[in-house]
């Protein structure tokens, strides 16, 4: 059996490792001219780290990332709404990692090249067309100037090519642009003095704007960390996104400044942190409505191509990794490739659709919104505003939906 993987992001590369581990041949085609370590920080949750541990990547990730120790939810005045340990410190058998997105992709890319060979990943290859027949699927690839560069044939084709997936567009030709909720997201990372434990994550704000801050790598000195931050705030009424959503549009600091003025985070000088950041990026916060199906014949979708979701709850990359494991297992177990794709879809589509809808409601960060709605001017006693059991239901309920509650995660 052979799989054609369209997209060399985290989901596509992990899929290649999963398939190789199970003895299934595969090729990865990426439209960018090179797989560069771009982006800013992300969190990778224990259920996904357990899968990467099974692939033998834990030591490499540990060297590149921060083991997240704790998470705080604060209101816009910096008052504590919720606090919980994370990863190993919460009793999981594997860590939660905060890491630079590009570094995570780089670790996985290096493993693919080492195990499958340099020819397993072809860059500068845009999918032009694919066609299925009774015996397999054929795909044609072109460079950015439109010249044909490759034709390949396999038993299945996996679209892991992101929110602007060309594979998804071929399967669902009249879907239209992604859904924008009217929120803009600004992100950046810079070296900064360590705060709290040096492994802490803070989410603060209210209904109109929120900010997240956490370290993603060691700094030049023990008391400094490469620190990731993100601010999300309303910029419109929603609908079609104002510009193409990607990770490479420079942010405008003057648009961010009024929103930052709303925050008071006791442990971090937010304005100074952002001012010290050499480059910042912005994009409209978008997702897509869940599809009724991902697979048609020998072709299926994975990761953001299948279920793009708002970046709350630290779930985007983690869910792509879970997709990869499920798809690889299905291809091994099923008697026919199409049966495998249907089994994969039946397992993963309902779960990810639920997360997409949960993220639209704010995900676990909805606990901040719930408290602000009840106490917009702050509080003297959080339990008098929203009892512990109700706050726990919001946060833990999301963990259950997303599959990373402690009892759900089984480490290798």
Regions found by a protein language model. Give the residues of each.
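FAD/FMN-dependent oxidoreductases across multiple families
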Residues: 195, 215-220, 224-225, 233-313, ...
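Conserved mid-domain beta->alpha element of the FAD-binding
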Residues: 6-33, 158-159, 186, 213, ...
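Conserved N-terminal glycine-rich FAD pyrophosphate-binding loop of Rossmann-like flavoproteins
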Residues: 33-51
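Residues at the starts of beta-strands that form the adenosine-phosphate
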Residues: 2, 25, 226-228
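Flavin-dependent oxidoreductases
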Residues: 184-216, 245
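Conserved N-terminal helical subregion
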Residues: 1-3, 20, 47-172, 176-189, ...
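Acidic/histidine metal-binding catalytic segments
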Residues: 64, 120, 262-279, 337-342, ...
């Amino acid at each position: 059996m052979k799989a054609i993987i369209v997209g060399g992001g985290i989901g596509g590369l992990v899929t290649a490792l999963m398939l190789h581990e199970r003895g299934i041949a595969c090729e990865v085609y990426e439209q960018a001219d090179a797989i560069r370590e771009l982006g800013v920080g992300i969190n990778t949750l224990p259920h996904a780290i357990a899968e990467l541990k099974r692939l033998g990547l834990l030591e490499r990730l540990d060297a590149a990332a921060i083991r997240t120790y704790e998470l705080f939810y604060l209101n816009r005045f910096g008052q504590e709404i919720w606090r919980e340990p994370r990863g190993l410190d919460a009793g999981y058998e594997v860590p939660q990692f905060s890491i630079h997105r590009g570094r995570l992709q780089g670790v996985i890319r290096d493993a693919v090249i080492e195990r499958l060979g340099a020819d397993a990943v072809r860059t500068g290859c845009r999918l032009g067309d694919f066609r299925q027949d009774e015996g397999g699927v054929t795909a044609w690839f072109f460079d950015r100037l439109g010249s044909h560069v490759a034709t390949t044939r396999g038993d299945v084709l996996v679209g892991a090519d992101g929110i602007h997936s060309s594979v998804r567009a071929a399967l669902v030709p009249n879907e239209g642009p992604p859904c924008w909720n009217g929120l803009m997201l600004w992100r950046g990372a810079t070296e900064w003095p360590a705060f709290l434990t040096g492994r802490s994550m803070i989410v603060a704000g209210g209904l109109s704007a929120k900010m997240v801050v956490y370290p993603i790598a060691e700094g030049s000195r023990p008391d400094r960390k490469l620190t990731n931050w993100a601010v999300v705030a309303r910029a419109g009424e929603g609908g079609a996104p104002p510009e193409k959503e990607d990770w490479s549009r420079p942010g405008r600091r003057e648009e961010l400044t009024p929103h930052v003025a709303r925050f008071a985070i006791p442990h971090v000088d937010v304005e100074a942190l952002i001012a010290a950041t050499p480059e910042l990026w912005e994009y409209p916060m978008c997702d897509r409505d869940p599809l009724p199906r991902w697979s048609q014949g020998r072709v299926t979708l994975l990761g953001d191509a299948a279920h793009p979701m708002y970046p709350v709850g630290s779930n985007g990359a983690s869910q792509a990794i879970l997709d990869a494991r499920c798809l690889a297992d299905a291809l091994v177990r099923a008697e026919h490739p199409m049966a495998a794709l249907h089994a994969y879809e039946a397992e993963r589509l309902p779960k990810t659709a639920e997360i997409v809808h949960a993220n639209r409601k704010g995900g676990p960060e909805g606990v901040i919104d719930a408290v602000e709605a009840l106490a917009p001017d702050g509080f003297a006693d959080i339990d008098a505003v929203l009892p512990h059991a109700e706050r726990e239901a919001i946060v833990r309920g999301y963990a259950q939906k997303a599959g990373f509650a402690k009892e759900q995660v089984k480490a290798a």
